[in-house]
A protein has these predicted regions:
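ABC family nucleotide-binding domain
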Residues: 1-170
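C-terminal boundary and immediately downstream tail of ABC-type ATPase nucleotide-binding domains
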Residues: 160, 167, 171-191
Length: 191
């Protein structure tokens, strides 16, 4: 989608600017979607290799090595030959995270990574994300997992109806919100 207003700045450059090579920036940004977006006709391993060979032009052996490294990191290496239909939602999301990591991005964008999961699967995905945060991975996470956001983030933006209501440190937002809409939302969260 093309933004209708505002700007997206990465490394000091406007990504929205028509003169900027958006494809070059996309190669530095990993995305993990709520619906996983895995290729159903490919194995777990193939899902983690294809982007590397097509976008980064890595040879297949190097791509396989990277894929195995990140599948191991998220605990999915025993499932390399499985197809997505054979996996639980939490397993699919961990494969999606491994696929994004195999591209070795500078930042990972997560769009509601736990919203499509059964409650018992949420924890395993959040644990992987918590590990990434502890390792210093820059992440932009859209989430309703408030405890996770409070514990892991260093900057929180609360939005409602597409508008930023308030932003600040986790302690600013969760312990001393200033905006009425933020206060109302957090009161329901604490209830």
């Amino acid at each position: 989608e093309t933004p209708t207003s505002g700007d997206v700045v990465f490394h000091g450059d406007s990504v929205v600017d028509k003169k900027v090579n958006a494809a070059a920036y996309r190669a530095k940004v990993g995305m993990v979607f709520q619906s996983f977006n895995l290729f159903n006709n490919m194995s777990v391993l193939e899902n983690c290799i294809i982007g590397q060979t097509k976008v980064l032009k890595r040879n297949k052996e190097e791509a396989k090595e990277k894929a195995m490294q990140y599948l191991t990191k998220v605990g999915m290496n025993p499932y390399i030959n499985a197809k997505p239909r054979q996996l639980s939602g939490g397993q699919k999301q961990r494969v999606a995270i491994a696929r994004a990591l195999a591209m070795e991005p500078e930042i990972l964008l997560f769009d509601e990574p736990t919203s499509a999961l059964d409650p018992e699967m949420v924890g395993e995905v959040l644990e992987v994300m918590r590990g990434l945060a502890n390792e210093g991975m820059t992440m932009l996470v859209v989430t309703h997992e408030m405890a996770f956001a409070r514990d892991v983030s260093n900057h929180v933006v609360y939005m409602a109806d597409g508008v930023i209501c308030e932003e600040g440190s986790p302690s600013d937002i969760f312990e001393n919100p200033q905006n009425a809409r933020t206060k109302d939302f957090l009161a329901r969260f604490r209830a």
